């Protein structure tokens, strides 16, 4: 199916939900079509929806509207970060939904500690600031955004907050296998999640194997590679999608979901939120799974942002969040 055709159809569906009163805001873990969500059980026993909504690069003044749209579609897992500078909008949307009847426990809210706050005292201080912006009593998942600064001191503070019940789960982001293994071995509480770049052209098989060995769930950022490599027009992905009457975006998300990879696609358009959520009514067969596995180029689509490059490390350490 062409994405344009799907967007036309889903725009109609979205309008019905917005103006026709057909949406059940209390429908737990279902989208507009009533398709059931799948959950991943983390190593601490907590459960995270395998499909969530990411707000990276969404301006603060547009975040509340986008998250409200996502919630109306059926998303309950929302991924933000201190560095995104839009926690206020996320919190406003989530709290509005709670006042509207959705239970707090239906949501799974994630934020991340930025590099400049990645110290023991920095975590404690910045966590309180994030929670004030989010307007929540507890957080479902707190991640270290980057593997830099005093990550062990930061982890001690995160572990303390988890033990106090302020955070349900703690994890990391952008940790390469060597750092992840060292972190898992030398901390009493292992990361529950490692959020990394992962898409059809950069599938990180070795990273996934290491994470599985240590019981750490893998979460994908940039599942669509921000459209790089002309991903949405890839003939292999298009052909597979057409077989199931699905778009390339849906095919990618379904592929990752069947690998038990948590996905958090971002879009500001409600019809695409619907599109991205409509991935639980089909299943890729083994041949199609292997075909997509074979297009892996085993290289990042963001080589201008290489976490192993000293210049990138200098840049990320030098970037301070505004007060």
Give the location of each predicted region.
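N-terminal export signals
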Residues: 5-26
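C-terminal segment of N-terminal export signals and the immediately downstream linker at the start
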Residues: 22-49
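Active-site mouth loops of central-metabolism enzymes
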Residues: 51-60, 113-119
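Glycine-centered flexible beta-alpha turn that most often forms the glycine-rich phosphate-binding loop
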Residues: 53, 78, 139, 170
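Short, acidic/polar
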Residues: 59-70, 119-133
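CE4/NodB-like, metal-dependent polysaccharide N-deacetylase domain
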Residues: 123-143, 160-164
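Beta/alpha (TIM)-barrel catalytic core signal, keyed to glycine-rich beta->alpha loops juxtaposed to Asp/Glu
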Residues: 146-323
């Amino acid at each position: 199916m062409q994405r344009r055709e799907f967007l036309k159809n889903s725009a109609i569906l979205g309008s019905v939900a917005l103006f026709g009163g057909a949406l059940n805001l209390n429908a737990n873990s279902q989208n507009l079509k009533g398709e059931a969500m799948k959950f991943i059980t983390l190593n601490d026993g907590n459960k995270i929806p395998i499909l969530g909504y990411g707000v990276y690069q969404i301006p603060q003044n547009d975040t509340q509207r986008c998250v409200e749209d996502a919630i109306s579609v059926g998303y309950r897992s929302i991924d933000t970060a201190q560095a995104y500078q839009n926690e206020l909008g996320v919190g406003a949307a989530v709290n509005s939904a709670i006042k509207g009847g959705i239970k707090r426990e239906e949501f799974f809210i994630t934020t991340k500690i930025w590099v400049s706050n990645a110290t023991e005292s920095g975590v404690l201080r910045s966590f309180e600031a994030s929670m004030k912006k989010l307007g929540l009593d507890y957080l479902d998942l707190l991640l270290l955004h980057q593997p830099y600064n005093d990550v062990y001191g930061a982890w001690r503070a995160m572990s303390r907050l988890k033990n106090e019940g302020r955070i349900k789960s703690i994890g990391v982001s952008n940790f390469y296998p060597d750092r992840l293994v060292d972190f898992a071995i030398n901390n009493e509480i292992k990361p529950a999640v490692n959020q990394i770049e992962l898409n059809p052209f950069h599938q990180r098989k070795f990273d996934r194997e290491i994470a599985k060995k240590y019981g750490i769930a893998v979460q994908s950022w940039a599942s669509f590679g921000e459209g790089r490599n002309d991903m949405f027009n890839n003939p292999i992905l298009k052909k597979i999608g057409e077989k199931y009457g699905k778009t390339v975006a849906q095919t990618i998300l379904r592929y990752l979901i069947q690998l038990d990879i948590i996905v958090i696609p971002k879009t500001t358009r409600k019809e695409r939120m619907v599109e991205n959520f409509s991935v639980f009514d089909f299943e890729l067969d083994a041949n199609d799974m292997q075909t997509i596995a074979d297009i892996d180029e085993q290289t990042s689509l963001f080589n201008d942002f290489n976490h192993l490059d000293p210049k990138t490390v200098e840049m990320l350490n030098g970037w301070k969040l505004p007060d």
